């Protein structure tokens, strides 16, 4: 087993991956017009909605457990379609100067409409009502595309609010922006861990240089990569699933306890 980073909290990673999985239950309940609730130990604070194809749908939530705060972002249910249709175009980031980010991630995070505030506004408005001394830790997390939104969200929080110590644990996240974005992120987000399955294709996207011929856009990952391995190279959905990430993290924990 590869050594985990010194400050990486395996128990917290499992908890945050499990919360990331809850966003899919939240989405399914919305789609099926059914009630949804978090596990009993968590208190729901805010539902985060996305505007997509003229519809509003849940993109995650803010919750708390005791003095711990959590911002949790949902990924996509149509992974193969997203990979096929993605253009990877970059645009200037709307909330940090002189950096470029992927168009779709920026739009998903910052877009609202007449009926619902943008996910960005909902998070920042909520945090404006909270004093950093009111909580022990502020955790930002997400899986897949939710991991990309989490990266945008935490750097926005660090740059534009008084909450300077938020902590990111993401799972199966793609690259989000250019070198300048990654550099700015790494300088102002103090605690950041990107858990990736070495067999998962999504963390390899967008390509570092794309499109393949013109190389118009250049992408770079933010810190710090925490590699794990499960599945194989032939099953995109399995290698990318949040359930697979949870299972492997739990296996690492068990192995760590046995070897201790």
Task: Give names to the regions the model predicted.
Residues 75, 144, 172-174:
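Residue-level signal for short, function-critical loop segments
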Residues 79, 150, 177-178:
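Short, well-ordered alpha-helical microsegments
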Residues 1-66:
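N-terminal low-complexity, Ser/Thr- and acidic-residue-enriched intrinsically disordered segments
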Residues 163-249:
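The feature captures the conserved acid-bearing segment of alpha/beta-hydrolase catalytic domains
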Residues 142-146, 150:
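Gly/Ala-rich beta-loop-alpha elbow adjacent to hydrolase catalytic centers
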């Amino acid at each position: 087993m590869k050594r985990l980073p010194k400050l990486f909290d395996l128990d917290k990673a499992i908890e945050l991956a499990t919360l990331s999985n809850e966003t899919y239950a939240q989405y399914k309940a919305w789609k099926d017009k059914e009630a949804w609730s978090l596990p009993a130990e968590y208190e729901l604070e805010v539902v985060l909605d996305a505007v997509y194809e003229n519809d509003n749908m849940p993109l995650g939530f803010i919750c708390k457990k005791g003095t711990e705060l959590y911002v949790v972002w949902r990924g996509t249910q149509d992974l193969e379609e997203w990979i096929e249709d993605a253009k990877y175009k970059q645009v200037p980031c709307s909330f940090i100067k002189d950096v470029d980010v992927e168009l779709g991630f920026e739009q998903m995070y910052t877009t609202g409409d007449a009926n619902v505030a943008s996910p960005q506004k909902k998070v920042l408005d909520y945090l404006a009502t909270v004093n950093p001394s009111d909580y022990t830790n502020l955790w930002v997390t997400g899986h897949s595309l939710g991991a990309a939104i989490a990266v945008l969200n935490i750097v926005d929080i660090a740059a534009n609010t008084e909450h300077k110590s938020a902590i990111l644990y993401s799972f199966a996240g793609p690259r989000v922006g250019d070198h300048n974005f990654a550099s700015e992120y790494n300088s102002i987000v103090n605690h950041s861990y990107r858990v990736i399955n070495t067999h998962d294709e999504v963390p390899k996207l967008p390509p570092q240089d794309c499109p393949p011929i013109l190389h118009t856009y250049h992408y770079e990952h933010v810190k710090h990569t925490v590699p794990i391995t499960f599945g194989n190279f032939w099953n995109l959905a399995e290698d990318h699933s949040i359930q697979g990430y949870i299972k492997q993290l739990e296996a690492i924990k068990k192995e760590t306890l046995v070897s201790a």
